Amino acid sequence: MSKTYNFYCDESTHIENDGQPFMILSYISTPYHLLKMHNQNIREMKIKHFYRGEMKWSSISKSQYPFYNEMIDYFFNSDLNFRAIVIDKSQLDHKLHNQSHNDFYDKMYYQLLNKKINPEFNYNIYIDIKDTHSYLKARNLKTYLERDYNNIRNLQVIRSYESELMQLTDVLMGAINYKLRGLNKVTAKNNIIEKIERHCGKPLTQKTDKAENKFNLFFIDLKNGN
């Protein structure tokens, strides 16, 4: 029987003209048979720290720091993996490539997932719903992936409150975006970023090795096609 993985995908500042310099797509993956354990462990941590509601990068504060600090350690000490791709939006030139921003978005999501799909395994892919267009984007992505793979068991949109791992994806991705934008006003967020960087052994402004599985960070250079 083939091993199955769940991917929990999210995006940050992905709208073309939102005034933000970077577009980030990311996911956390887990072996399916360990999903229940991770959900239970995270919920127990929330209870321990009297944390209510969703984990979000925007929610990190001095009072919530102990919970998020433990959550980062949990991620790096577990079998969970994270991958993100970063696009510098100043390099976007959709007219040159005869595409819309939605077309580009679909292509980037494919690039996010394509490099880590193993034909020997099966996959359930979940995408955080953002708006009414999310369903169409998910359908397009499913079409792209099924063109090259026959092991995508399920691809659907869900709301972040339905998934602890989707929420954790938001936290890790938020740390990357915060660091790249040079923001540093919230001490608790700075400390979380420093903790992630200690685990990774490098700053969040640098790409990781392509073969890195635990925390894979890739900066796409649209000008040079890589």
Positions of the model-derived regions?
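Phosphate-ester processing/binding pockets and catalytic centers
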Residues: M1-N226
